[in-house]
């Protein structure tokens, strides 16, 4: 799934985990979310993701200072980790590529980093038993 700042703000990670866990309960039981491995792919990093006061305040209110620090920058990956933890996914099962799409624009596309004109990324996930 894709979770830009609006998706993170709207708890898309929690909703996705709960939806999958509901579907997996018959197979994995009530603790299904604790068995999930999560990969956080390339994204705008906190050093490059500067926001206005309104968005910053929303993130502080939602997730605390851990992901909305210094008054203007937001750490989207930390917001996602907080959400996943709340949904029952163990932090030890979350892998963050930690590649900033703005800083590494020769490797990745970035809407913000490229002034609104950019390409697209693709990813897929496979469940194995």
Descriptions of predicted regions:
Residues 1-129:
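Active-site microenvironment for binding and transforming phosphate-containing groups
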């Amino acid at each position: 799934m894709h979770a830009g700042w609006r998706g993170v703000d709207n708890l898309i990670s929690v909703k996705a985990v709960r939806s999958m866990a509901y579907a997996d309960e018959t197979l994995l039981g009530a603790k299904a979310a604790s068995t999930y491995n999560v990969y956080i792919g390339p994204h705008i990093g906190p050093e490059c993701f500067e926001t206005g006061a309104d968005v910053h305040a929303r993130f502080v209110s939602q997730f605390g200072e851990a992901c909305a620090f210094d008054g203007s920058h937001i750490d989207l990956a930390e917001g996602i980790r907080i959400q996943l933890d709340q949904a029952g996914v163990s932090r030890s099962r979350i892998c963050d590529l930690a590649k900033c799409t703005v800083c590494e624009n020769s490797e990745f596309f970035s809407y913000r980093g490229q002034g609104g004109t950019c390409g697209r990324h693709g990813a897929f996930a496979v469940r194995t038993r």
